[in-house]
C-alpha cells in the first residue's frame, strides 16, 4: 500500500501512526485453514473485494490512521497497566481488599489448572478453536475470571445509537466460543 502525508503530520506522529502491531497468530496456530473472528464478521462483499483489490496499488493518507492507532494505543496502555504497572496499588486505591489482590494472577498458563481461589486475568491472549475444517482464531482484550471485557473506541453516534451493539455482542460470543 502506498502512503501519503497530505496533511503534513509531524514525523514523530507519522511514524507512530504507521506502526502495525497486529499479529494474526498464524505462526503459532494449529494446522488448518485459519479464520479470524474479525474476518468472519466482515460482510461477504467486503471479503470478496479485499481478495480482488491489489493493495500495492492502493493509497492511504497517514491522517486516516489516527482512529485505528488511538484504539490500538488504548489496548496497549491497558495491557501495560496490568503487566508493567503497579496494578496492586491501583486496586488498593480503589478499596479492593488485599485478600482479593493477593489471589490475582496475570496471564497464567491457560493449559494448566489454577490453584483454588486464584483469580486469573488474561490480557491480549490469542486463542484457537477447531470448527469443522477451519481454525477460528481471536485475540481477547481482557478476561477476568470468566468475565470477558472488550475495549472499544467508537464514535459518539455508534455509542448513542447503539448501532454496533449486535456486532459487539457477536464478537464477544465468538470469543466465548474460543475461550470457554
State where each predicted segment sits.
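Acidic active-site catalytic centers that drive phospho-/nucleotidyl reactions
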Residues: 141, 150, 171
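Broad hydrophobic/π-residue packing in well-ordered secondary structure
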Residues: 47-49, 151, 168, 175
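Metal-dependent nuclease catalytic cores that hydrolyze phosphodiester bonds in DNA/RNA
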Residues: 1-147, 159-161
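Metal-dependent nuclease catalytic cores in nucleic-acid-processing enzymes
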Residues: 76-82, 161-180
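Short beta-strand-loop-alpha-helix junction that forms the active-site gateway
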Residues: 151-163
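Secondary-structure boundary elements
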Residues: 144-148, 177-180
Amino acid at each position: 500500500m502506498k502512503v501519503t502525508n497530505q496533511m503534513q503530520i509531524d514525523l514523530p506522529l507519522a511514524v507512530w501512526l504507521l506502526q502495525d502491531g497486529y499479529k494474526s497468530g498464524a505462526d503459532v496456530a494449529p494446522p488448518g485453514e485459519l479464520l479470524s473472528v474479525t474476518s468472519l464478521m466482515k460482510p461477504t462483499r467486503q471479503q470478496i473485494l479485499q481478495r480482488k483489490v491489489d493493495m500495492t496499488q492502493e493509497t492511504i493518507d497517514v491522517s486516516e490512521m489516527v482512529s485505528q492507532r488511538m484504539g490500538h494505543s488504548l489496548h496497549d496502555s491497558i495491557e501495560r497497566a496490568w503487566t508493567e504497572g503497579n496494578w496492586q496499588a491501583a486496586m488498593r486505591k480503589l478499596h479492593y481488599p488485599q485478600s482479593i489482590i493477593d489471589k490475582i494472577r496475570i496471564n497464567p498458563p491457560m493449559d494448566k489448572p489454577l490453584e483454588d481461589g486464584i483469580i486469573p486475568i488474561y490480557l491480549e491472549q490469542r486463542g484457537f478453536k477447531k470448527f469443522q475444517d477451519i481454525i477460528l482464531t481471536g485475540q481477547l482484550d481482557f478476561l477476568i475470571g470468566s468475565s470477558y471485557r472488550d475495549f472499544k473506541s467508537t464514535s459518539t453516534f455508534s455509542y448513542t445509537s447503539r448501532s454496533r451493539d449486535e456486532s459487539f455482542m457477536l464478537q464477544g460470543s465468538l470469543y466465548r466460543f474460543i475461550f470457554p
